[in-house]
């Protein structure tokens, strides 16, 4: 069977010599599948590595600032062609060489890298104050959409997805080249593209085709199969039957097909592994370390999830009896409640759970109500340990504007089904009563926890402490009718601020001074430590992590004197950079994802 020729014309900006080598390699690979040659005789694995290396070198030479995107697209197209030719063969003629066995793993790695860089293009542009042209943004969105679709169906309809990805990528590159020739792209945008579009690491891509005996690339099928069995397996989502070895680097917005999962691409799951995918092992703070802090397992990410029910945590006497009655009669009296229309719609949306209190799913209590545990005095059940074990495998970061409840947990038969007391909200005085009587529209809007990067001292603090201090008004009494609320009486006069308490107030100059000091120490200590680690062989110097604003800030700080007078006006360059770091929390997280560093990783605060 002849090799397919439809994908050989979709490569981006290749020289005739590379195209000739590529055609010869695909032809020999098809002959290996037809058992005319052996993979070792024509060195398919080594030639595949060399052709991917040629893609990267060609993109670095002629791809300008977006050469990383061009190299990723060409490598993705190359492995898609190999997989298409393998699938077209019969089962007895395919899968007898190293490239055929490792092709799904390499395809998943390339797609993951393509999705990560396209996500970074949209996430980090606003935080770095980069304006994306409309034509480039539209073309990039189409590329990201096709990449996400292919990530779910990488083993199905390969020709259609491959052609769609390459067509969208070619359109993006053409728009970039045209606007660059016309002088419509600013230097900041081109530097941003060079920072975002990183090159794939071939050593990681071909790690499944390295012999454990010699340490070199091999075409021995037995060595490759034995190595693949030792790799950890991961799945895109719980309902997806396809599994992969490197899908653990995917963010949470790619782990489900529901639209709600992509509303907040900043809060990602498995970001510590995504750091390793982009820059190798780094010493930055991970989400796992921030999640398992001394303040509690889930306390760092929500103000409503406090702890598991136990005999040492009894509920309030009044609230317990009232909430138990509400939870038991919620299925029959949901239409007779005195709440507003929005709460009725929410009750109808939650009707499947409320009508079956003994279903296999975890029941979700209404807003403002404390769930009543069925057996509060019994010792901890085995299912609690099971929840801890499953949570260790995949961290869950709930959306700050959504109800903070974990998804239903898979359980074995024979365990208790009444799990209403799985998580208890934080007990606050009058919060449950006011929610029940006043309803959603009357209550004050819920305060959303501001996002802080992992490693920040504010990441594990409770919600009131992490929010900015705001003047708190008097507590209103519950209103049961439409009569206007009485005029609140003034409270006691505020106490005078003492000199000792004045130090606790926020000082912008002090915050700026601490930020400058932290950044200076990071530039003096963290970067030399990385260079020493690279010298010792723990990090490859040919793939340094992109730093973006960090390089510019370090250069600006080095040109200044040691004694920085904060009373005098700062330079415009330093003032803009400091404002970007201090006022934009998305940039802090974006820098942590891309570099593994954070200005709050030091112990100065």
Swiss-Prot record:
Keywords: Activator, DNA-binding, Early protein, Host nucleus, Host-virus interaction, Transcription, Transcription regulation, Viral latency, Viral reactivation from latency, Virion, Virion tegument. Residues 341-353 have a biased composition (Basic and acidic residues). Coiled coil: none annotated. The keyword Transcription regulation applies. InterPro entries: Herpes_TAF50 (IPR004998). GO terms for cellular component: host cell nucleus; viral tegument. Residues 321-338 have a biased composition (Low complexity). One of its GO terms (molecular function) is DNA binding. It is found in: Host nucleus; Virion tegument. Its main location: host cell. Residues 355-364 have a biased composition (Basic residues). Belongs to the herpesviridae Rta family. Immediate-early transcription factor that controls the initiation of viral lytic gene expression and lytic reactivation from latency. Triggers lytic replication, and initiates a cellular senescence program in epithelial cells. Up-regulates human DCR3/TNFRSF6B by directly binding to its receptor. Globally induces a proteasome-dependent loss of SUMOylated proteins in the host cell and the loss of promeylocytic leukemia nuclear bodies. Improves the stability of the triplex capsid protein TRX1 by reducing the ubiquitination level of the latter. Interacts with human ATF7IP protein, leading to promote and regulate host genes in virus-infected cells. Interacts with RNA polymerase III complex; this interaction downregulates small RNA transcription and 5'-pppRNA production. This is Replication and transcription activator. It comes from Epstein-Barr virus (strain B95-8) (HHV-4). The lineage of its organism: Viruses, Duplodnaviria, Heunggongvirae, Peploviricota, Herviviricetes.
